């Protein structure tokens, strides 16, 4: 037998073997698929039975908000409480639930925190479901593949929420898109989402492709072409999964033009997506009159630069501190010197990681020799925030591609001259010309920020007053009333199904 014939026989034997295995593999796959399908249907039936039992006992449909950090005190939490207030006022025959991962606090303490921080009182009580496994969505649990880890963790946290309470309508108000298919396909719920910030964006892909080091792209990755290529593939696959999860939503609300562009590109649901600007308590600031300082008072005044935002890495407080250091260096030559300005950093801490970041920032101030001119204010009540903003000269913001920027709007309403990052929502939606004139300043690096600070401080009181008044007029479109109207309009298709 020739070698060719022997090879042909071996090939034929291999084909026969593979063919003989195909049928058992097909049967096994069919069996496993059937078991999985029956299991999913069984779980779905069990959950729907729980909902029917609850409806019999309560007699009312329930709307649940998934917000694991509802006691954090940031802009996302303001959206949550304003949304709940609007829905409670409109729909008296619906009960409302909040899934939260906060531990060691009571429902009364959470609601009292919302009242103190945001000046928001709910007309009726809400039920809180306290989740025990919020750690699953903490970034510190996933030092590598953080996006994937947090997203998978959110699926398990969502499952815990669903088994604790099965709502009729589920709203993800914190950006955990991978919980949407859990509630839709297992819970049989109508689902909606309010997106503050896409979990992944084309900008993030660009950062990795161009190998730029940032807070979400470590130096050792940006400096290695192989690791950068692997991360690009990882991001692309994750973006596909994120888009599939997000597209499960029946109604999608986004908070800015910038977010809208990215969500449309990833979720591809234009008919179900609309922009609903987040609520900003502008009226509380607009009620405070602003006046013009004369030249004499101007020379004696200590100008405060105020930053409002949670102490998260992407807020880039380091940029604020370093730019402020450059401003102080330039102020040394002036008569009033360093004493003429101070930096006030106001924000909330969600967890120990944020508290450690504050310690690091305090250390940076010590290292730069400016600790005496920088003040940190953590988790302060609303009235104190209001006073600090109305007393400030400059409102400072440094986050790259901020999705919106409630703190920016509050600064403008309070009468500060805003200095924000030249990207994202601030550039596209907020710090835009109004009535033929500028409403603030934009910058993107330490030198630009220091230059803008110096320019603002050198403006005459009359010129600053004109810009402050113009900025105040421009922010009326971000009021609580505007948000409530837009939010209720977007939610109407879903809420109408509850009454059917």
From Swiss-Prot:
One of its GO terms (cellular component) is endoplasmic reticulum membrane. It is a single-pass membrane protein. It is found in: Endoplasmic reticulum membrane. SUPFAM superfamilies: UDP-Glycosyltransferase/glycogen phosphorylase. Belongs to the glycosyltransferase group 1 family. Glycosyltransferase 4 subfamily. Its EC number is 2.4.1.131. The gene is alg11. This is GDP-Man:Man(3)GlcNAc(2)-PP-Dol alpha-1,2-mannosyltransferase. Residues 1-20 are lumenal. It catalyses: an alpha-D-Man-(1->3)-[alpha-D-Man-(1->6)]-beta-D-Man-(1->4)-beta-D-GlcNAc-(1->4)-alpha-D-GlcNAc-diphospho-di-trans,poly-cis-dolichol + 2 GDP-alpha-D-mannose = an alpha-D-Man-(1->2)-alpha-D-Man-(1->2)-alpha-D-Man-(1->3)-[alpha-D-Man-(1->6)]-beta-D-Man-(1->4)-beta-D-GlcNAc-(1->4)-alpha-D-GlcNAc-diphospho-di-trans,poly-cis-dolichol + 2 GDP + 2 H(+). It is an enzyme of class 2 (transferase). The keyword RNA-binding does not apply. It comes from Danio rerio (Zebrafish).
């Amino acid at each position: 037998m020739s070698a060719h014939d022997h090879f042909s026989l071996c090939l034929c034997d291999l084909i026969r073997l593979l063919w003989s295995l195909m049928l058992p593999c097909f049967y096994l796959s069919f069996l496993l698929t059937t078991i999985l399908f029956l299991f999913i249907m069984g779980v779905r039936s069990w959950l729907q039975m729980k909902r029917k039992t609850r409806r019999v006992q309560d007699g009312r449909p329930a709307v649940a908000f998934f917000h694991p950090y509802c006691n954090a005190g940031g802009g996302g939490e303001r959206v949550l409480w304003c949304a709940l207030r609007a829905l409670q006022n409109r729909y008296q025959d619906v009960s409302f639930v909040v899934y939260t991962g906060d531990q060691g606090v009571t429902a009364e303490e959470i609601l009292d925190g919302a009242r103190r921080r945001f000046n928001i009182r709910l007309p009726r009580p809400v039920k809180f479901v306290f989740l025990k496994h919020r750690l699953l969505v903490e970034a510190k649990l996933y030092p590598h593949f953080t996006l994937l880890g947090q997203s998978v963790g959110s699926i398990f946290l969502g499952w815990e929420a669903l088994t604790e309470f099965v709502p009729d309508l589920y709203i993800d108000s914190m950006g955990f898109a991978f919980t949407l298919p859990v509630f839709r396909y297992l819970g049989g719920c109508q689902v909606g989402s309010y997106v503050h910030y896409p979990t992944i964006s084309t900008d993030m892909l660009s950062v990795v492709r161009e190998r730029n080091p940032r807070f979400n792209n470590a130096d050792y990755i940006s400096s290695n072409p192989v690791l950068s290529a692997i991360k690009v593939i990882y991001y692309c696959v994750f973006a596909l999964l994120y888009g599939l999860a997000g597209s499960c939503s029946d109604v999608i609300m986004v908070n800015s033009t910038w977010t809208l562009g990215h969500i449309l590109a990833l979720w591809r649901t234009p008919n179900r997506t609309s922009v609903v600007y987040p609520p900003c308590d502008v009226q509380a600031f607009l009620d405070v009159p602003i006046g013009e300082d004369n030249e004499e008072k101007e020379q004696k005044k200590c100008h405060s630069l105020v930053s409002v935002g949670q102490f998260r890495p992407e807020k880039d407080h380091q940029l604020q501190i370093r730019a402020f250091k450059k401003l102080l260096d330039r102020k040394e030559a002036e008569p009033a010197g360093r004493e003429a300005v101070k930096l006030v950093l106001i924000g909330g801490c969600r967890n120990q990681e944020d508290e450690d970041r504050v310690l690091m920032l305090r250390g940076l101030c010590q290292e730069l020799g400016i600790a005496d001119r920088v003040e940190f204010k953590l988790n302060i009540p609303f009235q104190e925030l209001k006073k600090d903003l109305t007393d400030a000269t400059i409102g400072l913001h440094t986050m790259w591609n901020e999705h919106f920027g409630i703190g920016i709007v509050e600064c403008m309403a309070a009468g500060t001259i805003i200095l924000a990052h030249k990207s994202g929502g601030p550039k596209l939606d907020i710090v835009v010309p109004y009535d033929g004139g500028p409403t603030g300043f934009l910058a993107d690096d330490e030198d630009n920020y220091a230059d803008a600070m110096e320019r603002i401080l050198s403006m005459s009181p009359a010129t600053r007053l004109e810009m402050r008044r113009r900025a105040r007029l421009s922010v009326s479109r971000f009021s609580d009333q505007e948000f409530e109207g837009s939010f209720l309009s977007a939610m109407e298709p879903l809420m109408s199904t509850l009454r059917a």
